[in-house]
Amino acid sequence: MKLFNTLTRQKEEFKPLVPGQVSMYVCGPTVYNYIHIGNARSAIAFDTIRRYFEYKGYKVNYVSNFTDVDDKMINEAGAEGTTVPELAERYIQAFLEDTRALNIEEATLHPRATHEIPAIIDFIQTLIDKGYAYEADGDVYYRAKKFADYGHLSDQNIDQLEEGASQHVNDEEQGRKEDPIDFALWKGQKAADEIAWDSPWGKGRPGWHIECSVMSTKYLGDTLDIHGGGQDLEFPHHENEIAQSEAKTGKKFVNYWLHNGFVTVGKDEEKMSKSLHNFVTVYDILKNVDPQVLRFFMASVQYRSQINYSEENLEQAANILGRFKNTLEGINYRLADATEGLPDPDLAKLVTETTAKFEAAMDDDFNVQNALTAIYEALPAVNSNANAEKADKESLRLFAKKLAAWLSVFGLDVDKLLAKEAGDDDAVIEELVAQRTEARKNKDWAKSDELRDQLKEMGVVLKDTPQGTRWSRE
């Protein structure tokens, strides 16, 4: 299996620290609002990656944090007239509800920054003791230039970074920082009513970057197999995590850095973000869109690529999902009949070849498009066999099992996909289908067509097969 490592800008063979196990940390949300689909994209991308590791037999220790104290949270809590903890609790629960709806597996652990304050203080003190950090008027800053590899992950040199930093430092910070490029590890309390904790440097709260260094190393060890997040976190967040963690431990922090692409909107494909006010929340989308369709839409694009959110692209995803559903229904319908099966060597070979193609694609940095193409190209032959006079039932049964496993990697629940919503008119539909079957048996084509038209007006789609007529709702 090969992964594209952002640190080296190339694909590398995946070699876990512990054979058969994967340690994986993914930056979670800052919980001051409902998540939008840009946030969901990251959660779905890394859930798909996790699921494929599990498909391959790995045990995955998946840690994803909640940033539950932050400038944005303080501002939002003030605007709403509530407290930061109350705001955090509300949106953590909303996040969990949204991710459950999208069939995102629960993390092994969801640490919260505010629950790790003692560990954060100890981590910062170690950096001070080693000369990598310094206190200034109640704040603590990291000496970025002291870390020799600073800028490596984002492929920037110190001069470039310093020039950019000097343009964003306010006068107050300038007076405290030794260098514009230095970043905050601890922020002193600015107002008496601002959320804060006691520390050796006075009351205050942690900086964003130190939170993830502490939580990832505390729960996964000094060196991680994989660290993931959005491409917008590459710098400064992940760059700073490396500087902090490796300065403290003296060890390589992460072996494989994975970054997912953005969700864009509109004809200009503008990045979706809260700051640009062009976002749509998962909560609002799911009022009108099937969760499985949204999940499949997000999971069906390779994680490093951008996704353009549009009604047309959602509809296309729904159509592809419908093809998979029809194939599974056709197989199940055929397996349920009493006809004797007939082995088909070509179909058996196709199942084996499709499995190999699917896994080869996913082993190539999780190339989901090629994996889906392999499945999609197998459907005509599978459908043809399912409708044949004598089907290869064993191969069909195996393909259905494989397809369920493949779709599960994409986060789809086959049982839910195949579940029919019971309607008050089901019995009426069954009776009309039976009457049409009898009319066809008697070659009363006019009556058959009349019944088909009547069923169509009821929103019922018919499919005639050698084994009988199947129906579904539009």
Swiss-Prot record:
Cellular compartment(s): Cytoplasm
Cofactor(s) needed by this chain: Zn(2+)
Keyword Zinc recorded: yes
Binding site for ATP: 274
Broad class of where this protein is predominantly found: cytoplasm
Residue ranges of coiled coil: none
Catalytic activity entry: tRNA(Cys) + L-cysteine + ATP = L-cysteinyl-tRNA(Cys) + AMP + diphosphate
InterPro entries linked: Cys-tRNA-ligase, Cys-tRNA-synt_Ia_DALR, Cys-tRNA/MSH_ligase, CysS_C, Rossmann-like_a/b/a_fold, tRNA-synt_1_cat_dom, tRNAsynth_Ia_anticodon-bd
CC cofactor note: Binds 1 zinc ion per subunit.
Keyword line: Aminoacyl-tRNA synthetase, ATP-binding, Cytoplasm, Ligase, Metal-binding, Nucleotide-binding, Protein biosynthesis, Zinc
SMART domains associated with the record: DALR_2
Molecular-function GO term, any one: zinc ion binding
GO (cellular component) term, any one: cytosol
Quaternary structure, from the entry: Monomer.
The family this protein is said to belong to: Belongs to the class-I aminoacyl-tRNA synthetase family.
Protein name per the record: Cysteine--tRNA ligase
Organism for this UniProt entry: Lactobacillus delbrueckii subsp. bulgaricus (strain ATCC BAA-365 / Lb-18)
Gene name tied to this protein: cysS
